[in-house]
A protein has these predicted regions:
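Short, surface-exposed secondary-structure junctions/capping segments
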Residues: 18-19, 85-96, 138-145
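Acidic, glycine-rich low-complexity/disordered segments
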Residues: 42-49, 53-54, 139-155, 289-315
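Extended assembly-interface regions of large multimeric machines
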Residues: 1-58, 93, 100-105
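Long, acidic/polar, low-complexity amphipathic helices and coiled-coil-like
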Residues: 100-103, 120, 125-204
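A glycine- and small-residue-enriched flexible loop/hinge signal that marks low-structured segments
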Residues: 24, 68, 90, 161-315
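Intrinsically disordered, low-complexity boundary segments flanking structured domains
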Residues: 17-23, 111-112, 156-159
C-alpha cells in the first residue's frame, strides 16, 4: 500500500488519501492498513469563507492558507476585491487534491468541504503565515472558519474489525466520546488476559484547555491518546496519522529510545501554548508539543488514563 494507491483508490481529495500521504511522508517501512467509510448520507458539509474588501493601492501577493496549503493571487494597483477573489478561487480549484471547493462571488471566496461530517470543521484557514507575507495595501480580509459540518459515519460495524485483531497504532478522525468509547471497549477487550493484544488509538482535537481535559477525564482510557491539535496547522486526523507514523518508525529504528522531544516533520506549527498551559494539559491526559522555530517537538505522549477502577488518581 502506498500514497499513490491511496489517491487512486479513495480519490486524491479524500480524507484517507491526505492521511496516508502524511503517513508515508514520515514512514515508508512500517505497513499501513486503512478502512474506507462512506459519508453519512444524512450528514452536512462544512462551509467557510474569506471576504475581501477595498481596492489595491499597492502591488503584492495575497497568500491564503487552507490546512497548511498556500494559495496565492498576484495583486496589481487598482485591482478590486472581486477581481482578487476570482483569482484566489481559481487558484484553490486548480488543486484537485484540496479538501474544499471554492466559489467567488463579489469579493468573497466561499469554501465547501468535500466530505460531510465534523471533519471539515477542522480545516484551518489563515491569511498569511510566513514573516515575509503581507496583504497588499488597500485590501482587507475577514475569514469565517469552516463550520456546520455534522453527521459522522457510525463505526459500530467497523469496530468489529478491531476485535481479536492486533493493530498496534490506530489513527481515526472521529473524536466524539461515543465513538472513542466504542474503540476503547474494543481495545480493552483485546488486552484481556486470554488475548493480550495491545493497541492504541490516537486522535487530534482542537479545543480549549478546559474542554480538552474534560474530554480526557471522561475517556480515562489506557488505550486512547488525545493530541492537542491547536499547535498544528492540520486536521486532527492528519496530525494523528503523522504521529503514529513517527512513533512506529521510531519504535522500529530505535526501540528503546522513547519519544520525548522527537520532531514531528512535515507539519507547519502554529503558536504554541505557554508552559503552564502545556503542563495543565499533560496533567489532564493530553499530549502536547513545544514549537522550536519551524519545528514541532513532542513534550510527551500520554494516554487519557488518570484514575484506576476505584476512581483513585494514578500518580
Amino acid at each position: 500500500f502506498s500514497k499513490s494507491q491511496a489517491k487512486l483508490l479513495f480519490g486524491e481529495n479524500s480524507m484517507l488519501a491526505h492521511a496516508a500521504g502524511r503517513y508515508f511522508d514520515i514512514n515508508k517501512s512500517v505497513a499501513l492498513k486503512v478502512i474506507a467509510l462512506d459519508d453519512n448520507v444524512a450528514g452536512t458539509v462544512s462551509t467557510g469563507n474569506i471576504t475581501l474588501t477595498g481596492t489595491a493601492t499597492g502591488t503584492g501577493t495575497l497568500s491564503f492558507y487552507i490546512n497548511g496549503n498556500v494559495y496565492t493571487a498576484a495583486v496589481a494597483i487598482g485591482d478590486t476585491a472581486a477581481e482578487i477573489a476570482t483569482l484566489l478561487s481559481a487558484s484553490i480549484n486548480e488543486n484537485t487534491a484540496e479538501q474544499v471547493t471554492a466559489i467567488a462571488t463579489v469579493g468573497e471566496v466561499g469554501l465547501t468541504s468535500v466530505h460531510k461530517g465534523t471533519y471539515g470543521n477542522e480545516l484551518k484557514l489563515r491569511i498569511n503565515y510566513n514573516s515575509d507575507e503581507s496583504t497588499p495595501l488597500g485590501i482587507t480580509s475577514v475569514i469565517t472558519a469552516m463550520n456546520g459540518g455534522a453527521g459522522n459515519p457510525t463505526l459500530t460495524n467497523t469496530i468489529t474489525i478491531l476485535e481479536e485483531n492486533q493493530f498496534n497504532l490506530i489513527a481515526q478522525p472521529y473524536t466524539d466520546n461515543a465513538t472513542l468509547g466504542l474503540i476503547d471497549t474494543a481495545l480493552t477487550d483485546n488486552f484481556k488476559a486470554t488475548e493480550m493484544l495491545d493497541g492504541f488509538c490516537v486522535v487530534g482535537v482542537d479545543d480549549t484547555i478546559t474542554n480538552l481535559t474534560t474530554k480526557t477525564d471522561a475517556l480515562n482510557s489506557a488505550f486512547i491518546t488525545v493530541l492537542d491539535n491547536n499547535t498544528v496547522f492540520s486536521t486532527g486526523f492528519e496530525h494523528a496519522t503523522g504521529v503514529i507514523a513517527k512513533i512506529s518508525d521510531n519504535a522500529q529504528s530505535n526501540p528503546g529510545g522513547g519519544y520525548l522531544g522527537f520532531e514531528l516533520t512535515g507539519f507547519l506549527p502554529l503558536t504554541q501554548r505557554i508552559r503552564t498551559e502545556r503542563n495543565s494539559l499533560a496533567g489532564g491526559g493530553v499530549s502536547t508539543y513545544t514549537v522550536v522555530g519551524s519545528s514541532i517537538r513532542f513534550d510527551r505522549t500520554v494516554t487519557t488514563l488518570q484514575k484506576d477502577e476505584n476512581a483513585i488518581a494514578i500518580p
